[in-house]
From Swiss-Prot:
Motif residue range(s): Nuclear localization signal: 309-318
Organism: Fowl adenovirus A serotype 1 (strain CELO / Phelps)
Protein name, as recorded: Preterminal protein
Task of the protein: Protein covalently bound to the viral DNA that acts as a primer for viral genomic replication by DNA strand displacement. Assembles on the viral origin of replication in an initiation complex with viral polymerase, DBP, host NFIA and host POU2F1/OCT1. The terminal protein stimulates the template activity over 20 fold compared to protein-free templates. Neo-synthesized viral genomes are linked to two preterminal proteins, one for each 5' end.
Sequence positions bearing O-(5'-phospho-DNA)-serine: S510
Post-translational modification: Preterminal protein is used to replicate viral genome, upon genomic encapsidation it is processed first into iTP and finally into TP by adenovirus protease.
Site (Priming of strand displacement replication by covalently linking the first nucleotide of the new DNA chain): S510
Subunit details: Heterodimer with the polymerase; this heterodimer binds to bp 9 to 18 of the genome. Interacts with host POU2F1; POU2F1 binds to the auxiliary sequences in the inverted terminal repeats and tethers the pTP-POL heterodimer to the origin DNA thereby participating in the assembly of the pre-initiation complex (POL-TP-DBP-NFIA-POU2F1).
Keywords (A to Z) from UniProt: Covalent protein-DNA linkage, DNA replication, DNA-binding, Host nucleus, Phosphoprotein, Viral DNA replication
Originating gene: PTP
Length: 575
Protein backbone atom coordinates (compact mmCIF):
# COMPACT_ATOMS: atom_id res chain seq x y z
CA UNK A 1 0.00 0.00 0.00
CA UNK A 2 2.91 2.33 0.74
CA UNK A 3 3.80 2.24 -2.97
CA UNK A 4 0.50 3.76 -4.06
CA UNK A 5 -0.92 7.27 -4.17
CA UNK A 6 -2.21 7.85 -0.64
CA UNK A 7 -3.48 11.38 -1.10
CA UNK A 8 -6.74 12.22 0.75
CA UNK A 9 -9.86 11.06 -1.11
CA UNK A 10 -7.79 9.29 -3.79
CA UNK A 11 -9.16 5.95 -5.10
CA UNK A 12 -6.51 3.99 -3.20
CA UNK A 13 -7.79 5.18 0.20
CA UNK A 14 -11.51 5.33 -0.60
CA UNK A 15 -12.41 1.99 0.98
CA UNK A 16 -12.27 1.05 4.70
CA UNK A 17 -10.28 1.13 6.84
CA UNK A 18 -8.85 4.31 5.27
CA UNK A 19 -12.24 5.93 4.69
CA UNK A 20 -10.83 8.49 2.25
CA UNK A 21 -7.89 9.45 4.48
CA UNK A 22 -4.16 8.59 4.31
CA UNK A 23 -2.84 5.96 6.75
CA UNK A 24 -1.61 7.21 10.13
CA UNK A 25 2.01 6.45 9.23
CA UNK A 26 4.10 6.82 6.05
CA UNK A 27 7.41 5.12 5.25
CA UNK A 28 9.37 8.10 3.94
CA UNK A 29 11.58 7.19 0.96
CA UNK A 30 10.18 3.67 0.67
CA UNK A 31 8.45 4.35 -2.63
CA UNK A 32 11.52 6.12 -4.06
CA UNK A 33 13.65 3.11 -3.10
CA UNK A 34 11.32 0.75 -4.97
CA UNK A 35 11.11 3.00 -8.02
CA UNK A 36 14.90 3.38 -8.36
CA UNK A 37 15.50 -0.37 -8.11
CA UNK A 38 12.63 -1.21 -10.47
CA UNK A 39 13.93 1.23 -13.09
CA UNK A 40 17.31 -0.48 -13.44
CA UNK A 41 18.33 -3.52 -15.48
CA UNK A 42 18.03 -6.09 -12.69
CA UNK A 43 16.57 -9.47 -13.60
CA UNK A 44 15.50 -10.23 -10.03
CA UNK A 45 14.46 -7.97 -7.16
CA UNK A 46 13.71 -9.16 -3.63
CA UNK A 47 12.48 -6.87 -0.84
CA UNK A 48 12.66 -8.65 2.51
CA UNK A 49 13.06 -8.27 6.27
CA UNK A 50 10.79 -5.24 6.34
CA UNK A 51 10.53 -4.17 9.95
CA UNK A 52 10.40 -1.30 12.42
CA UNK A 53 12.90 -0.06 14.96
CA UNK A 54 12.64 2.54 17.72
CA UNK A 55 16.05 2.92 19.37
CA UNK A 56 16.25 4.50 22.85
CA UNK A 57 16.88 8.14 22.06
CA UNK A 58 15.36 11.52 22.62
CA UNK A 59 13.17 12.43 20.96
CA UNK A 60 11.90 8.92 20.28
CA UNK A 61 11.67 8.16 16.56
CA UNK A 62 10.26 5.22 14.65
CA UNK A 63 12.28 3.90 11.70
CA UNK A 64 11.50 1.39 8.99
CA UNK A 65 14.17 -1.04 7.75
CA UNK A 66 14.32 -3.14 4.61
CA UNK A 67 16.89 -5.45 3.03
CA UNK A 68 16.91 -5.55 -0.77
CA UNK A 69 18.64 -8.07 -3.02
CA UNK A 70 18.73 -7.17 -6.73
CA UNK A 71 20.69 -9.15 -9.29
CA UNK A 72 21.24 -9.89 -12.96
CA UNK A 73 23.20 -12.47 -14.93
CA UNK A 74 26.03 -11.77 -17.35
CA UNK A 75 26.81 -14.19 -20.18
CA UNK A 76 30.55 -14.61 -19.82
CA UNK A 77 30.92 -17.81 -21.82
CA UNK A 78 29.76 -16.34 -25.11
CA UNK A 79 32.33 -13.55 -24.98
CA UNK A 80 35.17 -15.77 -23.80
CA UNK A 81 34.45 -18.20 -26.64
CA UNK A 82 34.45 -15.24 -29.02
CA UNK A 83 38.10 -14.66 -28.15
CA UNK A 84 38.97 -17.96 -29.85
CA UNK A 85 37.36 -17.17 -33.21
CA UNK A 86 39.35 -17.11 -36.44
CA UNK A 87 39.33 -13.33 -36.70
CA UNK A 88 42.21 -13.35 -34.23
CA UNK A 89 44.20 -15.49 -36.72
CA UNK A 90 45.30 -17.78 -33.94
CA UNK A 91 48.14 -15.53 -32.78
CA UNK A 92 48.41 -14.00 -29.36
CA UNK A 93 49.61 -10.61 -30.64
CA UNK A 94 46.63 -10.18 -32.93
CA UNK A 95 44.31 -11.39 -30.18
CA UNK A 96 45.78 -8.82 -27.81
CA UNK A 97 45.50 -6.01 -30.35
CA UNK A 98 41.93 -6.87 -31.31
CA UNK A 99 40.75 -6.97 -27.69
CA UNK A 100 42.54 -3.75 -26.78
CA UNK A 101 41.25 -1.94 -29.86
CA UNK A 102 37.72 -3.18 -29.22
CA UNK A 103 37.81 -1.69 -25.74
CA UNK A 104 39.35 1.66 -26.70
CA UNK A 105 37.01 2.13 -29.66
CA UNK A 106 34.02 1.29 -27.47
CA UNK A 107 35.13 3.74 -24.78
CA UNK A 108 35.16 6.51 -27.35
CA UNK A 109 31.88 5.43 -28.91
CA UNK A 110 28.53 7.06 -28.37
CA UNK A 111 26.43 4.04 -27.45
CA UNK A 112 23.68 4.64 -24.91
CA UNK A 113 22.30 1.65 -23.03
CA UNK A 114 19.53 1.86 -20.48
CA UNK A 115 18.07 -0.49 -17.92
CA UNK A 116 14.78 -2.28 -18.13
CA UNK A 117 11.67 -0.65 -16.74
CA UNK A 118 11.70 2.93 -18.02
CA UNK A 119 11.29 4.59 -21.42
CA UNK A 120 11.44 8.27 -20.47
CA UNK A 121 14.16 10.05 -18.50
CA UNK A 122 13.34 12.16 -15.51
CA UNK A 123 13.38 15.31 -17.65
CA UNK A 124 11.02 13.88 -20.26
CA UNK A 125 13.59 12.83 -22.86
CA UNK A 126 12.72 9.64 -24.74
CA UNK A 127 15.28 6.91 -24.12
CA UNK A 128 16.26 4.46 -26.89
CA UNK A 129 14.95 0.92 -26.86
CA UNK A 130 17.01 -1.54 -24.87
CA UNK A 131 18.50 -4.55 -26.57
CA UNK A 132 18.21 -6.77 -23.51
CA UNK A 133 20.15 -9.69 -24.98
CA UNK A 134 23.01 -7.45 -26.07
CA UNK A 135 23.19 -5.87 -22.66
CA UNK A 136 23.18 -9.19 -20.84
CA UNK A 137 26.30 -10.31 -22.70
CA UNK A 138 29.75 -9.51 -21.43
CA UNK A 139 30.50 -7.96 -24.82
CA UNK A 140 28.58 -4.75 -24.27
CA UNK A 141 29.82 -1.33 -25.33
CA UNK A 142 32.52 -1.00 -22.72
CA UNK A 143 33.17 1.53 -20.04
CA UNK A 144 32.03 4.30 -22.34
CA UNK A 145 28.80 2.50 -23.20
CA UNK A 146 27.15 1.07 -20.12
CA UNK A 147 28.72 3.63 -17.82
CA UNK A 148 27.87 6.58 -20.05
CA UNK A 149 24.33 5.30 -20.47
CA UNK A 150 23.83 5.16 -16.70
CA UNK A 151 25.42 8.58 -16.29
CA UNK A 152 23.21 10.19 -18.93
CA UNK A 153 20.08 8.68 -17.39
CA UNK A 154 20.84 10.12 -13.97
CA UNK A 155 22.11 13.51 -15.15
CA UNK A 156 20.10 16.68 -15.57
CA UNK A 157 19.64 18.13 -19.05
CA UNK A 158 22.36 20.73 -18.39
CA UNK A 159 24.80 18.13 -17.07
CA UNK A 160 24.07 15.84 -20.03
CA UNK A 161 25.06 18.60 -22.45
CA UNK A 162 28.26 19.30 -20.54
CA UNK A 163 29.15 15.62 -20.38
CA UNK A 164 28.62 15.30 -24.14
CA UNK A 165 30.95 18.26 -24.74
CA UNK A 166 33.60 16.75 -22.44
CA UNK A 167 33.38 13.45 -24.27
CA UNK A 168 33.62 15.13 -27.68
CA UNK A 169 36.76 17.03 -26.70
CA UNK A 170 38.40 13.96 -25.14
CA UNK A 171 37.78 11.89 -28.27
CA UNK A 172 39.08 14.71 -30.48
CA UNK A 173 42.27 15.02 -28.41
CA UNK A 174 42.82 11.25 -28.53
CA UNK A 175 42.44 11.14 -32.32
CA UNK A 176 44.65 14.22 -32.74
CA UNK A 177 47.50 12.72 -30.71
CA UNK A 178 47.25 9.50 -32.70
CA UNK A 179 47.31 11.39 -36.01
CA UNK A 180 50.35 13.31 -34.80
CA UNK A 181 52.18 10.14 -33.74
CA UNK A 182 51.69 8.48 -37.14
CA UNK A 183 51.58 11.58 -39.35
CA UNK A 184 47.99 10.98 -40.50
CA UNK A 185 47.25 14.57 -41.51
CA UNK A 186 46.19 13.64 -45.05
CA UNK A 187 43.13 15.90 -45.32
CA UNK A 188 43.13 19.68 -45.35
CA UNK A 189 40.79 19.71 -42.34
CA UNK A 190 43.36 17.81 -40.27
CA UNK A 191 46.47 19.39 -41.80
CA UNK A 192 45.48 22.87 -40.64
CA UNK A 193 45.95 21.68 -37.03
CA UNK A 194 49.61 20.76 -37.32
CA UNK A 195 51.49 22.43 -34.44
CA UNK A 196 52.52 25.89 -35.55
CA UNK A 197 49.51 26.57 -37.77
CA UNK A 198 47.84 29.97 -37.51
CA UNK A 199 44.51 28.31 -36.59
CA UNK A 200 45.84 28.13 -33.01
CA UNK A 201 45.74 31.94 -32.82
CA UNK A 202 41.96 31.97 -33.32
CA UNK A 203 39.91 32.16 -30.08
CA UNK A 204 37.48 29.51 -31.37
CA UNK A 205 40.11 27.00 -32.46
CA UNK A 206 38.99 24.40 -29.88
CA UNK A 207 35.53 24.24 -31.45
CA UNK A 208 37.02 23.73 -34.93
CA UNK A 209 39.43 21.19 -33.42
CA UNK A 210 36.59 19.13 -31.91
CA UNK A 211 34.66 19.19 -35.18
CA UNK A 212 37.70 18.06 -37.18
CA UNK A 213 38.82 15.14 -35.00
CA UNK A 214 35.93 13.94 -32.79
CA UNK A 215 34.00 12.18 -35.56
CA UNK A 216 36.94 10.28 -37.08
CA UNK A 217 36.64 6.49 -37.13
CA UNK A 218 38.96 5.19 -34.40
CA UNK A 219 39.47 1.76 -35.90
CA UNK A 220 40.03 3.19 -39.37
CA UNK A 221 42.82 5.40 -37.98
CA UNK A 222 44.48 2.31 -36.51
CA UNK A 223 44.19 0.46 -39.82
CA UNK A 224 45.67 3.45 -41.67
CA UNK A 225 48.65 3.50 -39.30
CA UNK A 226 49.17 -0.25 -39.64
CA UNK A 227 49.28 0.03 -43.44
CA UNK A 228 51.59 3.02 -43.38
CA UNK A 229 54.16 1.49 -41.03
CA UNK A 230 53.80 -2.22 -41.84
CA UNK A 231 57.10 -3.98 -41.25
CA UNK A 232 58.61 -1.15 -39.16
CA UNK A 233 59.84 -2.76 -35.95
CA UNK A 234 60.89 0.58 -34.50
CA UNK A 235 57.26 1.76 -34.43
CA UNK A 236 54.93 0.83 -31.59
CA UNK A 237 51.79 -1.19 -32.31
CA UNK A 238 49.08 1.31 -33.35
CA UNK A 239 46.57 -0.36 -31.00
CA UNK A 240 48.78 0.32 -27.99
CA UNK A 241 49.44 3.84 -29.22
CA UNK A 242 45.71 4.47 -29.38
CA UNK A 243 45.36 3.13 -25.83
CA UNK A 244 48.05 5.53 -24.62
CA UNK A 245 46.35 8.40 -26.43
CA UNK A 246 43.05 7.50 -24.81
CA UNK A 247 44.67 7.29 -21.37
CA UNK A 248 46.14 10.74 -21.89
CA UNK A 249 42.68 12.25 -22.28
CA UNK A 250 41.72 10.93 -18.83
CA UNK A 251 44.56 12.84 -17.18
CA UNK A 252 43.54 15.66 -14.87
CA UNK A 253 46.17 17.99 -16.31
CA UNK A 254 49.20 18.02 -18.57
CA UNK A 255 51.53 17.14 -15.68
CA UNK A 256 49.65 13.84 -15.19
CA UNK A 257 50.51 12.72 -18.72
CA UNK A 258 53.92 11.41 -17.74
CA UNK A 259 52.47 8.07 -16.64
CA UNK A 260 50.78 7.51 -20.00
CA UNK A 261 53.89 7.73 -22.14
CA UNK A 262 52.75 11.04 -23.60
CA UNK A 263 54.75 14.15 -22.98
CA UNK A 264 54.82 16.82 -25.57
CA UNK A 265 55.95 16.68 -29.14
CA UNK A 266 58.71 14.19 -28.36
CA UNK A 267 55.72 11.86 -28.10
CA UNK A 268 57.02 8.47 -27.01
CA UNK A 269 54.15 6.75 -28.76
CA UNK A 270 56.26 5.58 -31.65
CA UNK A 271 59.98 5.41 -32.21
CA UNK A 272 60.34 8.32 -34.56
CA UNK A 273 60.70 12.05 -34.25
CA UNK A 274 58.59 14.80 -35.70
CA UNK A 275 61.36 15.76 -38.12
CA UNK A 276 60.52 12.60 -40.09
CA UNK A 277 57.53 14.49 -41.49
CA UNK A 278 58.04 15.49 -45.09
CA UNK A 279 57.43 19.07 -46.13
CA UNK A 280 57.80 22.35 -44.33
CA UNK A 281 56.35 23.29 -40.98
CA UNK A 282 53.01 25.16 -41.32
CA UNK A 283 53.13 28.95 -41.25
CA UNK A 284 50.68 31.77 -40.75
CA UNK A 285 49.35 33.99 -43.51
CA UNK A 286 52.42 36.20 -43.21
CA UNK A 287 54.80 33.29 -43.73
CA UNK A 288 55.89 33.14 -40.08
CA UNK A 289 55.64 30.02 -37.92
CA UNK A 290 53.51 30.29 -34.79
CA UNK A 291 55.47 30.03 -31.53
CA UNK A 292 54.51 28.26 -28.32
CA UNK A 293 54.38 31.52 -26.37
CA UNK A 294 51.85 32.96 -28.83
CA UNK A 295 49.66 29.88 -28.49
CA UNK A 296 50.04 30.08 -24.71
CA UNK A 297 48.70 33.63 -24.62
CA UNK A 298 45.57 32.63 -26.53
CA UNK A 299 44.85 29.65 -24.24
CA UNK A 300 42.53 31.39 -21.69
CA UNK A 301 40.41 32.90 -24.49
CA UNK A 302 40.24 29.58 -26.35
CA UNK A 303 39.11 27.73 -23.22
CA UNK A 304 36.47 30.31 -22.34
CA UNK A 305 35.18 30.44 -25.93
CA UNK A 306 34.73 26.66 -25.96
CA UNK A 307 32.81 26.71 -22.67
CA UNK A 308 30.73 29.76 -23.57
CA UNK A 309 29.45 28.19 -26.78
CA UNK A 310 27.20 26.00 -24.63
CA UNK A 311 23.74 27.25 -23.64
CA UNK A 312 23.82 29.76 -20.80
CA UNK A 313 21.77 27.49 -18.55
CA UNK A 314 24.69 25.08 -18.22
CA UNK A 315 27.17 27.62 -16.91
CA UNK A 316 27.36 27.85 -13.13
CA UNK A 317 30.79 28.90 -12.00
CA UNK A 318 33.90 30.44 -13.44
CA UNK A 319 37.39 29.05 -13.13
CA UNK A 320 40.05 31.53 -12.08
CA UNK A 321 41.75 32.73 -15.26
CA UNK A 322 45.12 31.29 -16.14
CA UNK A 323 47.97 33.55 -15.01
CA UNK A 324 49.13 35.97 -17.67
CA UNK A 325 52.59 35.34 -19.10
CA UNK A 326 55.33 37.46 -17.51
CA UNK A 327 56.29 40.68 -19.35
CA UNK A 328 59.70 39.35 -20.29
CA UNK A 329 58.05 36.40 -22.07
CA UNK A 330 55.91 38.80 -24.12
CA UNK A 331 58.99 40.77 -25.10
CA UNK A 332 60.81 37.60 -26.07
CA UNK A 333 57.85 36.48 -28.19
CA UNK A 334 58.17 39.51 -30.43
CA UNK A 335 61.76 38.56 -31.16
CA UNK A 336 61.19 34.81 -31.57
CA UNK A 337 62.15 33.16 -34.81
CA UNK A 338 61.30 29.73 -36.06
CA UNK A 339 63.14 27.09 -34.07
CA UNK A 340 63.70 23.42 -34.84
CA UNK A 341 61.91 20.38 -33.48
CA UNK A 342 61.91 21.46 -29.81
CA UNK A 343 59.61 24.38 -30.67
CA UNK A 344 57.09 22.04 -32.26
CA UNK A 345 57.20 19.85 -29.16
CA UNK A 346 56.28 22.87 -27.06
CA UNK A 347 53.44 23.68 -29.45
CA UNK A 348 52.04 20.17 -29.10
CA UNK A 349 52.29 20.50 -25.32
CA UNK A 350 50.26 23.69 -25.58
CA UNK A 351 47.53 21.96 -27.61
CA UNK A 352 47.28 19.24 -24.94
CA UNK A 353 47.25 21.74 -22.06
CA UNK A 354 44.56 23.86 -23.70
CA UNK A 355 42.31 20.86 -24.38
CA UNK A 356 42.75 19.49 -20.84
CA UNK A 357 42.12 22.92 -19.35
CA UNK A 358 38.90 23.19 -21.36
CA UNK A 359 37.84 19.74 -20.13
CA UNK A 360 38.57 20.87 -16.58
CA UNK A 361 36.54 24.04 -17.06
CA UNK A 362 33.58 22.02 -18.33
CA UNK A 363 33.86 19.64 -15.37
CA UNK A 364 33.76 22.62 -13.03
CA UNK A 365 30.42 23.55 -14.57
CA UNK A 366 28.91 20.15 -13.70
CA UNK A 367 26.64 19.78 -10.71
CA UNK A 368 28.15 18.13 -7.65
CA UNK A 369 26.31 14.86 -8.27
CA UNK A 370 27.50 14.62 -11.88
CA UNK A 371 31.11 15.30 -10.88
CA UNK A 372 31.00 12.41 -8.42
CA UNK A 373 30.80 9.85 -11.25
CA UNK A 374 34.60 10.13 -11.48
CA UNK A 375 34.72 8.11 -8.25
CA UNK A 376 33.67 5.01 -10.18
CA UNK A 377 36.19 5.22 -13.04
CA UNK A 378 38.29 2.15 -13.75
CA UNK A 379 39.34 2.03 -17.43
CA UNK A 380 42.55 3.99 -16.98
CA UNK A 381 43.82 1.59 -14.30
CA UNK A 382 43.10 -1.42 -16.51
CA UNK A 383 44.71 0.09 -19.62
CA UNK A 384 47.80 1.13 -17.69
CA UNK A 385 48.19 -2.36 -16.22
CA UNK A 386 47.82 -3.98 -19.66
CA UNK A 387 50.42 -1.75 -21.29
CA UNK A 388 52.82 -2.10 -18.35
CA UNK A 389 52.54 -5.90 -18.44
CA UNK A 390 53.14 -5.90 -22.21
CA UNK A 391 56.22 -3.69 -21.87
CA UNK A 392 57.60 -5.93 -19.10
CA UNK A 393 56.96 -9.13 -21.07
CA UNK A 394 54.73 -10.50 -18.30
CA UNK A 395 51.61 -11.02 -20.35
CA UNK A 396 50.40 -14.38 -21.58
CA UNK A 397 47.12 -15.64 -22.94
CA UNK A 398 45.78 -16.40 -19.45
CA UNK A 399 46.64 -12.86 -18.36
CA UNK A 400 44.76 -11.36 -21.30
CA UNK A 401 41.70 -13.51 -20.76
CA UNK A 402 41.59 -12.59 -17.08
CA UNK A 403 42.07 -8.91 -17.99
CA UNK A 404 39.08 -9.05 -20.35
CA UNK A 405 36.92 -10.82 -17.77
CA UNK A 406 37.64 -8.43 -14.92
CA UNK A 407 37.47 -5.37 -17.16
CA UNK A 408 33.88 -6.19 -18.04
CA UNK A 409 32.95 -7.17 -14.50
CA UNK A 410 34.35 -3.83 -13.35
CA UNK A 411 32.28 -2.11 -16.02
CA UNK A 412 29.05 -3.70 -14.81
CA UNK A 413 29.70 -3.24 -11.09
CA UNK A 414 30.99 0.34 -11.40
CA UNK A 415 28.04 1.38 -13.57
CA UNK A 416 25.48 -0.16 -11.23
CA UNK A 417 27.12 1.24 -8.11
CA UNK A 418 27.10 4.71 -9.67
CA UNK A 419 23.41 4.37 -10.52
CA UNK A 420 22.60 3.32 -6.94
CA UNK A 421 24.88 6.02 -5.55
CA UNK A 422 23.19 8.74 -7.60
CA UNK A 423 19.75 7.73 -6.30
CA UNK A 424 20.51 6.86 -2.69
CA UNK A 425 23.48 9.06 -1.73
CA UNK A 426 23.80 11.98 -4.15
CA UNK A 427 20.03 12.58 -4.00
CA UNK A 428 19.77 14.91 -1.02
CA UNK A 429 16.01 14.58 -0.71
CA UNK A 430 16.31 10.81 -0.37
CA UNK A 431 19.22 10.99 2.09
CA UNK A 432 17.26 13.42 4.22
CA UNK A 433 14.95 10.57 5.24
CA UNK A 434 16.81 7.32 4.43
CA UNK A 435 20.29 5.95 5.21
CA UNK A 436 22.15 3.04 3.63
CA UNK A 437 23.31 0.88 6.55
CA UNK A 438 24.88 -2.02 4.66
CA UNK A 439 26.08 -2.44 1.08
CA UNK A 440 27.12 -5.79 -0.32
CA UNK A 441 28.17 -7.00 -3.77
CA UNK A 442 28.04 -10.72 -4.45
CA UNK A 443 29.59 -12.28 -7.58
CA UNK A 444 28.99 -15.97 -8.34
CA UNK A 445 30.46 -17.78 -11.35
CA UNK A 446 28.81 -20.84 -12.92
CA UNK A 447 30.00 -23.39 -15.46
CA UNK A 448 28.00 -24.93 -18.32
CA UNK A 449 26.68 -27.61 -15.93
CA UNK A 450 25.28 -24.98 -13.54
CA UNK A 451 27.96 -25.86 -10.99
CA UNK A 452 29.39 -23.03 -8.90
CA UNK A 453 32.95 -22.17 -9.95
CA UNK A 454 33.70 -19.33 -7.56
CA UNK A 455 31.96 -16.96 -5.18
CA UNK A 456 33.08 -13.57 -3.88
CA UNK A 457 31.44 -11.16 -1.45
CA UNK A 458 32.39 -7.57 -0.66
CA UNK A 459 30.55 -5.90 2.20
CA UNK A 460 30.67 -2.45 3.80
CA UNK A 461 28.96 -0.93 6.83
CA UNK A 462 30.91 2.32 7.01
CA UNK A 463 29.82 5.95 6.84
CA UNK A 464 26.63 6.07 4.70
CA UNK A 465 27.97 9.11 2.81
CA UNK A 466 31.06 7.23 1.57
CA UNK A 467 29.93 3.61 1.69
CA UNK A 468 29.63 3.23 -2.11
CA UNK A 469 33.01 4.66 -3.02
CA UNK A 470 34.72 2.75 -0.18
CA UNK A 471 33.31 -0.55 -1.42
CA UNK A 472 34.15 0.25 -5.05
CA UNK A 473 37.77 1.04 -4.19
CA UNK A 474 38.07 -2.38 -2.54
CA UNK A 475 36.50 -4.18 -5.51
CA UNK A 476 38.68 -2.37 -8.06
CA UNK A 477 41.84 -3.09 -6.06
CA UNK A 478 40.79 -6.73 -5.80
CA UNK A 479 40.17 -7.03 -9.57
CA UNK A 480 43.47 -5.40 -10.50
CA UNK A 481 45.40 -7.66 -8.14
CA UNK A 482 43.61 -10.75 -9.48
CA UNK A 483 44.78 -9.89 -13.00
CA UNK A 484 48.27 -8.82 -11.98
CA UNK A 485 48.89 -12.03 -9.98
CA UNK A 486 47.51 -14.37 -12.65
CA UNK A 487 48.73 -17.95 -12.14
CA UNK A 488 50.80 -17.20 -9.02
CA UNK A 489 48.75 -19.13 -6.45
CA UNK A 490 50.55 -22.47 -6.89
CA UNK A 491 53.92 -21.00 -5.97
CA UNK A 492 52.70 -19.03 -2.97
CA UNK A 493 53.73 -19.98 0.55
CA UNK A 494 51.69 -18.95 3.58
CA UNK A 495 53.49 -15.62 3.90
CA UNK A 496 52.85 -14.76 0.23
CA UNK A 497 49.19 -15.70 0.59
CA UNK A 498 48.78 -13.46 3.62
CA UNK A 499 50.54 -10.63 1.78
CA UNK A 500 48.17 -11.03 -1.18
CA UNK A 501 45.11 -11.02 1.10
CA UNK A 502 46.48 -7.88 2.74
CA UNK A 503 47.02 -6.24 -0.67
CA UNK A 504 43.38 -6.75 -1.65
CA UNK A 505 42.26 -5.76 1.88
CA UNK A 506 40.49 -9.07 2.41
CA UNK A 507 37.91 -9.00 5.19
CA UNK A 508 35.89 -11.63 6.99
CA UNK A 509 32.70 -12.70 5.23
CA UNK A 510 34.26 -11.74 1.88
CA UNK A 511 34.23 -15.31 0.61
CA UNK A 512 36.18 -18.38 1.67
CA UNK A 513 39.93 -17.68 1.74
CA UNK A 514 40.70 -20.79 -0.31
CA UNK A 515 38.18 -19.70 -2.94
CA UNK A 516 39.76 -16.24 -3.09
CA UNK A 517 43.21 -17.72 -3.64
CA UNK A 518 41.98 -20.26 -6.20
CA UNK A 519 40.61 -17.40 -8.29
CA UNK A 520 44.20 -16.57 -9.18
CA UNK A 521 44.49 -19.84 -11.13
CA UNK A 522 40.89 -20.03 -12.28
CA UNK A 523 40.54 -20.95 -15.94
CA UNK A 524 38.17 -18.44 -17.52
CA UNK A 525 37.04 -21.03 -20.09
CA UNK A 526 35.20 -22.84 -17.28
CA UNK A 527 32.95 -19.86 -16.59
CA UNK A 528 29.72 -19.77 -18.56
CA UNK A 529 27.79 -17.09 -16.67
CA UNK A 530 28.17 -14.80 -13.70
CA UNK A 531 25.46 -13.58 -11.35
CA UNK A 532 26.03 -10.11 -9.89
CA UNK A 533 23.94 -9.30 -6.84
CA UNK A 534 23.65 -5.98 -5.00
CA UNK A 535 22.32 -6.16 -1.46
CA UNK A 536 21.42 -2.99 0.40
CA UNK A 537 19.94 -2.51 3.86
CA UNK A 538 17.97 0.73 4.20
CA UNK A 539 16.83 2.57 7.31
CA UNK A 540 14.24 5.31 6.87
CA UNK A 541 12.06 7.57 8.96
CA UNK A 542 8.44 6.68 9.67
CA UNK A 543 6.27 9.79 9.62
CA UNK A 544 3.45 9.65 12.20
CA UNK A 545 0.28 11.59 11.41
CA UNK A 546 -0.65 14.53 13.64
CA UNK A 547 -3.78 15.47 11.73
CA UNK A 548 -6.77 15.13 14.09
CA UNK A 549 -9.06 13.73 11.40
CA UNK A 550 -6.57 10.95 10.56
CA UNK A 551 -6.01 10.19 14.25
CA UNK A 552 -9.77 10.04 14.88
CA UNK A 553 -10.16 7.61 11.97
CA UNK A 554 -7.39 5.44 13.46
CA UNK A 555 -9.06 5.38 16.87
CA UNK A 556 -12.36 4.48 15.22
CA UNK A 557 -10.79 1.64 13.23
CA UNK A 558 -9.01 0.28 16.32
CA UNK A 559 -12.24 0.47 18.35
CA UNK A 560 -14.19 -1.43 15.70
CA UNK A 561 -11.40 -3.98 15.50
CA UNK A 562 -11.44 -4.49 19.26
CA UNK A 563 -15.23 -4.87 19.25
CA UNK A 564 -15.02 -7.48 16.49
CA UNK A 565 -12.44 -9.45 18.49
CA UNK A 566 -14.57 -9.35 21.65
CA UNK A 567 -17.71 -10.41 19.73
CA UNK A 568 -15.87 -13.32 18.15
CA UNK A 569 -14.56 -14.39 21.55
CA UNK A 570 -18.07 -14.43 23.01
CA UNK A 571 -19.24 -16.64 20.15
CA UNK A 572 -16.24 -18.89 20.63
CA UNK A 573 -15.16 -18.36 17.05
CA UNK A 574 -11.67 -17.46 15.89
CA UNK A 575 -11.53 -14.06 14.23
Amino acid sequence: MQLRDLAPRSPNVAAPPYNGLPPPHLLLGYQAMHRALNDYLFDNRVFMQIGYDSPPQRPRRLFWTCLTDCSYAVNVGQYMRFLDLDNFHGTFTQMHNAVLMDRVAADMGRAHLRGRGIDVGRHGQVLPQLDAEHHSLLSGNGAGGLQEGVLMRTASAADAELLAAIRQLRVALCHYLFCYAYDLFQTEERYRFLPGSDVFLEPNWLSYFAEAFAELDTQQLVRDAERKFRGRRDVEEPTETMARCFMSTLASDAVSLAGTGLSGGAITLCSRRVTDRTGLRPRDRHGRAITASEARRIRPRAVRAFVDRLPRVTRRRRRPPSPAPPPEEIEEAAMEVEEPEEEEEELLDEVIRTALEAIGALQDELSGAARRHELFRFANDFYRMLLTARDAGLMGESFLRKWVLYFFLAEHIASTLYYLYSHFIANREFRRYVDVLTLQVLVVGWDVNAQQVFKRIWSEQSNPATIFETLWERILRDFLMMVERTGQFEGMDDADQQLFLSDIQYRDRSGDIEEVLKQLNLSEELIDSIDISFRIKFKGIVAIATNEEIKANLRRVLRHRREDIEAAARRGQPL
